[in-house]
Amino acid sequence: MRGAELDRACAGLFCVGFHGTAPSPEILELVRRGVYGVILFGRNVESAEQVAELSGALKRAAQRPFMITVDQEGGRVARLRALHGFTEIPAMRVVGREGNPGLAREVGVLLGRELRAVGIDQDYAPVVDVDSNPANPVIGDRSFGRDPELVGRLGAALAVGLQSEGVAACAKHFPGHGDTSQDSHRHLPRLSHAMERLDAVELAPFRALSMAGVASVMTAHVVFEALDPQRPATLSLAVMRLLRERCGFHGPAISDDLEMKAVSEHFPLEQTVPDTILAGVDGFLVCHTAERQHRAIDLLRKAIEEGRVPRERLVEATGRIALLKKFAGDPPDVLQVRERLRATKRPELAGRLPSALPGRDPTAV
């Protein structure tokens, strides 16, 4: 594998963001280059029909299984809102207070049906960080609660519900972002927990999600000093091997956005890209800048050509992303979107979930 074939294989490990509510020339160029999917933000959303049209246009442009992905957690972090025609799901803390796996599964089913109606294939949910630090500025009510067993049980139920509707779930943020006092969108958090504590608290929900068959896991840009004082989890083999060895998860691991300040302001992209794949991460999220997206692909190709990343590792990562792409659906029927969304409405479920003001979205940076 070399030349154009190698370039396309490297691009095939990237999921990228873009600006606008229709396919831009920049995103179409990346689709042609071979990226496996896109991530949608609020900047890409005007209405349900428009999202369906956008999803379909990108899938048709790709002419291959192509992933449309989104953060649709509920509460503060949801790109698709009631004003667009979607159900306003409360924060997962509200679901956690009910303590009912059946309810969590119903929430997952509802999310999955609405996302599938507009052509979205993967939801970066559930958050299975344990809410163990009241001063945490970024997790808080995005978590199901303070009890690791509860977080794992409800997170697994929600993931099963999502995936029953053909939408890939993603457990995040491995190995745990719940006890930090800094936001990795803006800073590089550090935790000094011993392995015993990590195993009992932070890792427990990820084991539960792995056993439940979650389709993917997202990494945390957090330094775990007892394991690797130099690198955040995303770039650390010492941390990421816990996902395979302690949690038993052998599917695709996806990085959090490599443009977040926890990574971009502390590590050059020339280090970040090879370190991330060598750590055992299979897919790269690069969410904002076309120039940086192309450069990251170039840097991965260069690292493989120079032998700094074994070709076997590229093959392994490609195989795991292929598992994720099994969730890639056909372009949605735009004319049926409103009817499908109306059919998903669950007033009795809404009655069991107290509404709450979403609050500030910590991921909107």
Where are these regions (language model features)?
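Glycine-rich anion/phosphate-binding loops
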Residues: 46-53, 96-114, 145-153, 196-201
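Short glycine/serine-rich loop/turn segments
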Residues: 87, 122-146, 165-169, 173-192
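Second-shell residues forming the walls of enzyme active-site clefts
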Residues: 4, 17, 25, 43-61, ...
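Short, flexible, mixed-charge acidic loops at enzyme active sites
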Residues: 78-89, 176
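Structural recognition of alpha->loop->beta junctions
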Residues: 16, 31-35, 88-105, 194-214, ...
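Preference for extracellular/luminal or secreted protein segments
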Residues: 1-35, 246, 265-365
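Catalytic domains of carbohydrate-active enzymes, especially glycoside hydrolases
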Residues: 29-41, 110, 117-122
